[in-house]
């Protein structure tokens, strides 16, 4: 379509559709047709008008006019329109399918009607008369779309009147449509038979609907129109002010503008009406040419708005904030949220908006929407500013308090608007900010100061963390970032910065400082820069030194050595000549050594030469003084001085003995006399020859010396030289030694004499001992006579004493008899005491009989009496032991789940270890990579799994302390509770996904959701899911009964996998382990049922025994093989053995039906019943074969074939089954499979037909086994669980699920929600609406969003959280909720239990009617206080609901009143009957008491079961640990082999008595260049390579090498070279790499060099 003019080029009016030209005569039918076409055209114009108006309001394109009706059916555009004029009613978030993706994919959905309803509610909110409203079905079902367009037109006029939207255009006659489009619309209108609404009467209807006095309003509007025609502004304004016109916001200064605008509007309307009436026969309306009240008000608002905008623009130009605020308050604009205190903010924001608008090329003033946006932005900015000030104040207060965690918490406050803060660096923030705060003049940091400081400190924190983890890239990125604020960063010094920072970090740790500060980092950078600069200057200085040496001038050499940049130590001017001699000699030696005449000395060589020269000078001076002292001592005649001088270490004389001091002195004095006899030349100089071949000149007068020969030098003739002195000493010492040799033998004679004297003494001692031994009999006789005499005398004395004391003896006897009598009495008493326990037992037996009778009454009686129930009601209390058992149970569940995940992760890592060891053998990876992975395995990943579950305190994470995150957390808890307790959703979801995706989903999410069935509740719910899913699969997927056997049903696979894992592993082990172990231990058992195999084994055996080749053919058919008698014999033996061992397996299986997990048996029952329901004609045998396929073939058979893979048997690390053992087990499994399916051996296996009869007999046993296995109770009977169990359990269910699993589940539910829950009011739709769109991993964890390809994202997705599941739709005890009969019953029973415990009575009615005594009330209060104390100690996951806690605070009387209220409601609901005194409730309480006992028993059994599972998992972890040890020993062997092959040569003296040291290799760059290893060094000529040395040293870590570079002896840099990185580069085909960012090396040749020198390969 296109816009067209009303008049053609000739000025003739153009006919419209339906018009009749003057020369045109039409029939009645043609006129009707033309009229229908005109109606269609007019409606299309209205559609175009509505489309353009909505586009202006929404700011987005709508579908073409001919498709607009269809595009409005989903209500999205209508809902967006509702949001435009009433955002409070219609939120964008509540618009269903806002982007219309679902509509485009699947068409209309019933929930699209929500959008239409929201639009209608929005119109109702603003007050549009309901006479214009369409029905929902008019739009959704397209029953009356013109009604919708009519409503949009009315809405546009109404909004124009309110000043909320622009006026809709009148496009009649101004747009063109094709003939086809008009005909299509005509057909569409005729199809539905729709009566076209009167669009032209909208204004009048709207005025009538909104007015009180229609006649007065009509007259006032006509008067205004007449005044407009007169074009007198004063008259028009007077008419407008008529109260009956109901016009508002009139401003007299704008009267002339009102007149102009209204006059123009009326002229336009009259023109449009004229065009329309020329081509229409319908009845005209008075308002077709007159302006309606709404149009008048709309134009007034338009003028007011324009005027207000002009005033605002003027205020902005003048920069007057007060005038701007007054202009913004104009009612015509209707701006919301204006606050006078924010006037300056409005001025700033609107000036900015205006400037931006002008920059974009728009010069018109800011419009109303832009002003509102600016006001909102300014209010927000002002509010943020105030909040920011408050947050900054809190931060300063927290810094002053000195609590690092509190400071970081305040810094992380979003209202502070600070850069990102990292909690792990809390101490760093506290320390540095506190320092800055103290330095601040006002001791408070401003927001800009905090922003800069936090930004820099965060960067420093990241640097610290990167240094700890060794992340080099992150360290450099932060160092070079402008955010960090470091200065003088040089990229070429990058590696040095990193090395120094690593050392600084290590030093900080050693000093117990967790972080290095910004100042530390800046100082480190400055230090490195200084060192680099000094190195450069030092190299230049070394060059100057070498040049001076070549010139041969000692003074120039001295000046060069004294250059400060060289930093040479110990340079002395007086040693200049010796420096020259020493260094030039060293330079020549180096040139000869490397055969390069241009060789130069390096720094360490020059420094060494200086130190050596200084040392030589000191030693020469001491030597000269020592020789002079000897001469002086000899001349003085003092023997002591002479000996002391001779023994001085400075002169280096040997063989000096103190005993020969006088002889030395006399001999030297004699030598002196001989020199004197020759004559004295009186020279003051002496020349000494010193080590190194140099002469040292010593002045005897000044006692100084030097290396330079003095002018006119003459050697002093009187001084003894060292050689002369040494010669004299050697002669004297030799003579003394000969004399002492004789004196050395005196000790031998002394020792000989001592031995002789000792012999004589020993001989005398032995003689005395022999004499005494001969006299022993006589000595013994004398001693015995003496003892006998003494004993007889003592006896006689005792008899005499007793005879003299007879009275006393009688008294003693009487006392003894009394003691005996008393003892008999006491023994009798003790007898009674000893039998007190028997008496107590008798009494207890009587009491127990009474209690047993009461308990039998409680258990068996239909209506147990109140008295009996009251005795046992205390059993309903939760004791400390109950709480402890619940805590133990929760802890054990968590540990089991953690251990399951740990073992799974460990198993995956072990598999990866297998692969890496295999690659190691193929030289694809380095040994060190395997070693590092091995170290990782030893931790068993428990720490990692534990850390993954600690997400709760991350900033912005799912468990962050904010209302938004709390709502998100609760929404997920509600969702997963619904999924867990309603199996229909997951059962349908499984079959909505592809096979591979559903399997992964089940393995991860479903088992996690049910905590791997770690307790009774979760096992019950999981089995419900299995049951529902299996029934769904059979119903929708299975067309033939054999598909269960031939296919791979999803649910069956999941059930078998679950029950064969950790949960059913013990069962399989108990059933199969004994017989499997027996088979494996029988080494003689060899089952072969293939005749060809038997034949080949026989032939091989004959050839091995005879040593000759057999004449029999090797390749034969089974028939040919069976032709040999030996083969038949061996086959019969194998069959007998196979039948015997198979029978053992069969007996073990059929006798262990009770050991099979209940879940496995229950699913077998469900499978049988479901198949029978779908295939009623299937026989019993056919169904049992399917059950056999499940219980035996899928569940047991794999464990028999591969017992090692299913932990049926234990193998040592590295151990495995032999081929014969596997073949034996495979043959047995095949037999059992044939027996379970009643399949005979035929065809190719005809030679086994002899055991077909045995198979038939075995099938009958299997048949009875399968029938028994299916005979199990239903879930509710087995677990005693129903839909109300969660309302009374002590603890809330908790699951541990990863972030990735949460997001995956959320995504799948959104994608398939219509399939799994087709009903619109299904609860899951509400829960998914609560959650909204699928969140990102980062938003749930609390990390900042990063790169989509971030490799850490996968690790983040595995982070686990715990969700405490709750039910949103049934909250017991909530007073504001509608409580059903069950909830009221539970609450009432709980209160009754509390009352009857403390108040006795025969019936409940009697107790409720009898007032409680004060003693009963006091006892009740004490009990409630004890309960409150116990509840306070209860963990959050076990706390009771709020209403239960409130009930505990009631008195007995209040509780009785609440009970009576509950009983009244229950009576009305028909739950209880007051005629029998509410005996039903007493019976329910009795049942609860019985069930509480069963629950405790189940809990104990569950705890035992979990402990067994935990032990089994620990055993499996131990096995994995053994595998780890096995791998480590293998790796150690590889390392030992590698080390033993290394070609590290050692000198003999190093090999003997010393530990071997790490060898280091030194190469010049020139040598490496010759070998091809070094390609080039940037900025260095090849002829300078000889001055560069590379030193390669192995580190403590295998495969790591430290490479040091020196230039002219100056230590430049150190580079860590990783052998595994080299291999990786080689594997990737990288031929060249850089060292030190400058030296390019050949990767392959470098690997070859390292292998050759360090690994010997």
Swiss-Prot record:
WW domain ranges (all copies): 679-712
Bias kind Basic and acidic residues: ranges: 1417-1448
Annotated phenotype, changing residue 1443 to A: Abolishes neurite outgrowth promoting activity
C2, as annotated region: 1276-1657
Ranges for region C1: 956-1274
Calponin-homology (CH) domain boundaries: 44-159
Residues where Phosphoserine is found: 2, 330, 1441, 1443
Modification N-acetylserine occurs at: 2
Pfam families registered for this protein in UniProt: CH (PF00307), IQ (PF00612), RasGAP (PF00616), RasGAP_C (PF03836)
One Gene Ontology biological process: cellular response to epidermal growth factor stimulus
Domain Ras-GAP stretches: 1020-1269
GO cellular component terms, A-Z: actin filament; apical plasma membrane; axon; basolateral plasma membrane; cell cortex; cortical actin cytoskeleton; cytoplasm; cytoplasmic ribonucleoprotein granule
GO molecular function: actin filament binding; cadherin binding; calcium ion binding; calmodulin binding; GTPase activator activity; GTPase inhibitor activity; MAP-kinase scaffold activity; molecular adaptor activity
Tissue expression notes: Expressed in the placenta, lung, and kidney. A lower level expression is seen in the heart, liver, skeletal muscle and pancreas.
Recorded superkingdom: Eukaryota
Quaternary state and interactors: Interacts with CDC42; the interaction is demonstrated with IQGAP1 in GTP-bound and in nucleotide-free state. Interacts with RAC1. Does not interact with RHOA. Interacts with TSG101. Interacts with PAK6. Interacts with TMEM14B; this interaction increases IQGAP1 phosphorylation and induces its nuclear translocation. Interacts with SASH1. Interacts with PJVK. Interacts with SLC26A4; this interaction enhances the chloride-bicarbonate exchange activity of SLC26A4. Interacts with SVEP1. Interacts with ILK; the interaction is required for localization of IQGAP to the cell cortex. (Microbial infection) Interacts with ebolavirus vp40.
Function, as annotated: Plays a crucial role in regulating the dynamics and assembly of the actin cytoskeleton. Recruited to the cell cortex by interaction with ILK which allows it to cooperate with its effector DIAPH1 to locally stabilize microtubules and allow stable insertion of caveolae into the plasma membrane. Binds to activated CDC42 but does not stimulate its GTPase activity. Associates with calmodulin. May promote neurite outgrowth. May play a possible role in cell cycle regulation by contributing to cell cycle progression after DNA replication arrest.
Identification of the protein by name: Ras GTPase-activating-like protein IQGAP1
Organism: Homo sapiens (Human)
